[in-house]
Amino acid sequence: MASGLTAQEEYTFDLSEIEKKPFHFGGYLEFRPVFLDLDRDSLLYNLRFYDLDEGESIAEYNFNALLDFSYDKGIFSAKIRTNTDITKSFSGWSHETTLYEAFLSVKPSLSFHLDFGKKRMKWGKGYAFNPAAFIDRAKNPNDPDLALEGFVVISVDYIKSFKGKLRTITLTPVLLPVYDHINSDFGEWNKLNFGGKVYFLLYDTDIDIMFLSGGSGPARYGIDFSRNMTSNFEIHAELAYIPDYSKKVIDQSGSVIEENYANTSYLLGIRYLTRSNTTFIIEYFKNGSGYTPSEMDDFYFLIEQAYEDYLLTEDDTQLNFLAGGESQAYRTFAPMQDYLYLRISQKEPWDILYFVPSLTSIINLTDGSFSLAPELLYNPVTNLELRAKITVLVGKDRSEFGEKQNDFRLEFRGRYYF
């Protein structure tokens, strides 16, 4: 009898313990101190700190909480992602909570999905740049893996599978409304934009064809592909074409003019993994909306002139204008036209478990300036990630990285996942 009871106890288990729970809560908490060594002779330093004396360096302390809530049961699922930033900088304390994603999904079959709400579309194949990501916010090439805020959309995925060289087709039509309280920063208000993407898995190659139109911005068309040439070597590319693009340019007189032209942007990239677990990511980015050397030189000339006028008259009107929205494209990531991105990372060198050093460089091929960022990533215990990163900026006067507000940036990051 005792033997029988032992056998029954050995093979008894609770089905509820292995069933997938419909609710999930996760995310991470992060602390990220940043130290900047300021370049007090640079033009962008003068533009931002012209009326302040912050010394040779400044410190910034960032606290971040990314929270994910999801529900998945039957044909229905939902996801909410929020991001809270609390920052202590030279200007004081600030905080902001942003709803990154909040959408409902209905999946009545494996071939049909309907999504409604705020979400990221994640179009494009580039790692650091995505010129064909028409319904996504631009990545930060200095940290491409950062979570980003989505847009409110209605999208459908219809998936069809085949036998043969063409394995899969997915049709993804998208509606994107733009009003004063919905996607208000996307473009012109009171417009209902329509876009779409067609995905093909053809000859073991991922191919996307996409478009977006509707009036909030000029119509645009794109294509991308990625293919694993071998198990450790991948190539990818994407192209965006905007036939009626309008670019704001500030000329030497300080007037804002609009240049209209057909804009073509594209990206070519590779990802290669060696036998020793070294990963190389290389991308060339042609930014068709970027500024020419003469246009950037005009902008730098205006800052220099405005700063000299401020020193003589204490009139900062022109400096405030150059630091405002009209010139934002001059001060964003990759403001010019030709860039090379390189990242080299080594997994667990010298048999140090959970340790990944890397080196990243972004090179402006037009003016020769560049950033160089060595980084150390370590996971000492489960769910805890520690990162140390130094970014050094190198460039001559009137070059992109030579005129940044700082010479180098030292950053630590502790992130706990749950």
Please name every model-derived segment.
Residues 156, 342-344, 405-418:
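Outer-membrane beta-barrel "beta-signal"
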Residues 44, 234-347, 359-361, 401-403:
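Extracellular/periplasmic loop regions
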Residues 13-46, 76-80, 169-173, 357:
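Transmembrane beta-strand segments of Gram-negative outer membrane beta-barrel proteins
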Residues 31-37, 73-77, 84-88, 118-122, ...:
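Transmembrane beta-strands of outer-membrane beta-barrel pores
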Residues 74-80, 111-114, 163-169, 202-209, ...:
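Repeated loop/turn-to-beta-strand initiation elements of outer-membrane beta-barrel proteins
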Residues 50-55, 87-90, 138-142, 181-184, ...:
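Extracellular loop and loop/strand-boundary signature of outer-membrane beta-barrel proteins
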Residues 57-63, 95-100, 148-152, 190-194, ...:
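Residues that define the transmembrane beta-barrel architecture of outer-membrane proteins
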Residues 63, 68-176, 200, 395:
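Outer membrane beta-barrel
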